[in-house]
Amino acid sequence: MSQYTEKEPSVMDQDSSKAAWPRAAGGYQTITGRRYGRRHAYVSFKPCMTRHERSLGRAGDDYEVLELDDVAKENTAGSSSLDQVHPSLPSETTVEKSETEIPTCGPALNQSTESNPSVATVCHSEEVRETLDSSTNLQNHAERECTPAVCNASSVQNGIVLVHTDSYDPDSKHDENDSLQLCAQAVEGGRRQKVLGNAVFELENGEVERYADLCPSVPSLSGEIREESEELGSALLEKNSAGDAEAVHQDGQEFQRSSEDGIVRKRRQDDTDQGRQTENSTEDADCVPGHVEQNTSERANHHGSSPEQVVRPKVRKVISSSQVDQESGFNRHEAKQRSVQRWREALEVEECSSDDPIIKCDDYDGDHDCMFLTPSYSRVTPREAERHRATAENGATASGRQEARENAFWNACGEYYQLFDKDEDSSECSDGEWSASLPHRFSGTEKDQSSSDESWETLPGKDENEPELQSDSSGPEEENQELSLQEGEQTSLEEGEIPWLQYNEVNESSSDEGNEPANEFAQPEAFMLDGNNNLEDDSSVSEDLDVDWSLFDGFADGLGVAEAISYVDPQFLTYMALEERLAQAMETALAHLESLAVDVEVANPPASKESIDGLPETLVLEDHTAIGQEQCCPICCSEYIKDDIATELPCHHFFHKPCVSIWLQKSGTCPVCRRHFPPAVIDASAAASSEPDLDASPANDNAEEAP
């Protein structure tokens, strides 16, 4: 039934503004107090929608549920008597009574009114309640009880509570002394008006319009209300009994209240909610039925945890297709700000999901430009994400709860990536799909098993993941997800495992071959190890891997290969580290050999031209009898042929004349045995003191060859 009485102290000082009077046992109550330093200006009521729209409302249309926290008891010393009724309006009062209208909150309101002597009831007096109870008994609907916990409305003439908060005007002149004033209802040809506090309601065929800033005061109408109730009660009951009988019996003991144009106007300090409330204006709210629900258990919980009793409404709203179209006009900046909170709300629903990380572009609403494709949470449909986003935006969530939710989210992500440690085949992305790859899928190569007897072991290391949303040209706009760094734990090396090597110096390479990226030539299977971690002699390894080591030049000191190319297979990185060490060892060996060669040249100066020309020459015959058993020149490795000129050194080694002449011009030694050949110009004393044996031995040899 429509409730025409509310309790509100007209005069409240600064101290009493933070409290309100005791909650009625079964009815709605007027709330005057502070919420985050703001004030609740007034509480108004609206009638419900028509029977046709009520049936649509039961079909599952949008509802807005307003859950009010408990409020503290009011300091009754500062309360004043009831405001007077506006004298300009007619003194007649219309009390509409249908089959669905029963005194649901009458006893509770009367009880709370009697406990507060400073506030007088206007509508729910004993006479009016007796009249309404008698009207209800005539329609055999006395089985409906006043439920203190839940009071839902779904009838033609019932009303809903509107809690209007002045949260955006800190300097607002709506002082805390604004009280609810019950004014007369004017009956003008089927039109009934009533003024409640700062709001005037025009009741015409079950519709309500609210006009603010009207504060009339007229004498009390308790007597007129009783007379008007008796007068119009029977007529209205007869008019509405036939149409509403079915709905009354279906509702049972639970009352549902809704309004044709009822919408909860709620202002918050959040800029996002301000934009949403601006679009959901009264013009667009004609098709949105309201649903008011009071939960005493919820209020009891908040009453025990809140030191200062405030009103914290929580609106749970099911977003319809029309409202989704209205929200498409929001700018991108607001959508980006809400993206993180939307994802966290979606994670709570999809926390236990383990579906494959594929989400289709067709299912994604292009109006929102932020989307997260974490594999275990990627199956969130756009409508579900929108529903959770609306819950997160409109709900008055405490900061402690928000921090706990953030911690739970990041912990879930960390546990997921730590547990997801097995190899998976990379999935192909078809048209209209995005592939949210895992850290292993961003590797340049797949983890193939080696062809050797011993299988590869995955080495621990750091993987820096850069998941990016890839889509075709027809897909909507997307943003790259922020980099997430996943660190692996370093474990001790076991037998047969390759050590993880990193280099701390700049690479210098003379390779001028191809400039392909590292992930294109990464072939871990081409790298073989035997049982002792030794490289097998496979000459095709270096040929197959067309490595351009200049790609790794310029890295900062202390930056290893693993950090530089985090998306490459760790096995390939290990191979590159070993290859680098081998290259360094080879360069060291070559440098040592070059130093040795220089020392030899210094110790053995080149032979003189006269000494070279004085060497004996031998003509090679067909049977090679002149040169003995030698078949080829040791310098050029060419076989001796007939009529070639061979030269014999003092050590009895034969060479081609041109070959040995070039050699002796660089070093005065035999290319085969390194025996000293007499130098070109040398001091006799130095020669006699330093190398007497070397000079004597060739002489003896020549003496022996002469006979």
Curated annotation (Swiss-Prot):
Residues 1-10, 246-276, 381-391 have a biased composition (Basic and acidic residues). It catalyses: S-ubiquitinyl-[E2 ubiquitin-conjugating enzyme]-L-cysteine + [acceptor protein]-L-lysine = [E2 ubiquitin-conjugating enzyme]-L-cysteine + N(6)-ubiquitinyl-[acceptor protein]-L-lysine. Residues 465-481 have a biased composition (Acidic residues). Residues 549-569 are annotated as: Mediates interaction with TBC1D31. It is found in: Cytoplasm; Cell membrane; Endoplasmic reticulum membrane; Golgi apparatus membrane. The modification N-acetylserine is found at residue 2. One of its GO terms (molecular function) is protein kinase A catalytic subunit binding. Residues 530-707 are annotated as: Interaction with PRKAR1A, PRKAR2A and PRKAR2B. GO terms for biological process: inflammatory response; innate immune response; long-term memory; positive regulation of JNK cascade; positive regulation of p38MAPK cascade; positive regulation of toll-like receptor 2 signaling pathway; proteasome-mediated ubiquitin-dependent protein catabolic process; protein ubiquitination. It is a peripheral membrane protein. Gene3D superfamilies: Zinc/RING finger domain, C3HC4 (zinc finger). Keywords: Acetylation, Cell membrane, Cytoplasm, Cytoskeleton, Endoplasmic reticulum, Golgi apparatus, Membrane, Metal-binding, Phosphoprotein, Synapse, Transferase, Ubl conjugation pathway, Zinc, Zinc-finger. It comes from the Eukaryota. The keyword Cell membrane applies. It holds the Pfam family zf-RING_2. Its EC number is 2.3.2.27. Pathway: Protein modification; protein ubiquitination. One of its GO terms (cellular component) is glutamatergic synapse. Has E2-dependent E3 ubiquitin-protein ligase activity. Responsible for ubiquitination of cAMP-dependent protein kinase type I and type II-alpha/beta regulatory subunits and for targeting them for proteasomal degradation. Essential for PKA-mediated long-term memory processes. Through the ubiquitination of MFHAS1, positively regulates the TLR2 signaling pathway that leads to the activation of the downstream p38 and JNK MAP kinases and promotes the polarization of macrophages toward the pro-inflammatory M1 phenotype. Plays a role in ciliogenesis by ubiquitinating OFD1. Binds ubiquitin-conjugating enzymes (E2s). In vitro, interacts with the ubiquitin-conjugating enzyme, UBE2D2. The phosphorylated form interacts with PRKAR1A, PRKAR2A and PRKAR2B. Binds the catalytic subunits of cAMP-dependent protein kinase. Interacts with MFHAS1. Interacts with TBC1D31; the interaction is direct and recruits PJA2 to centrosomes. PANTHER family: NEP1-INTERACTING PROTEIN-LIKE 2. This is E3 ubiquitin-protein ligase Praja-2.
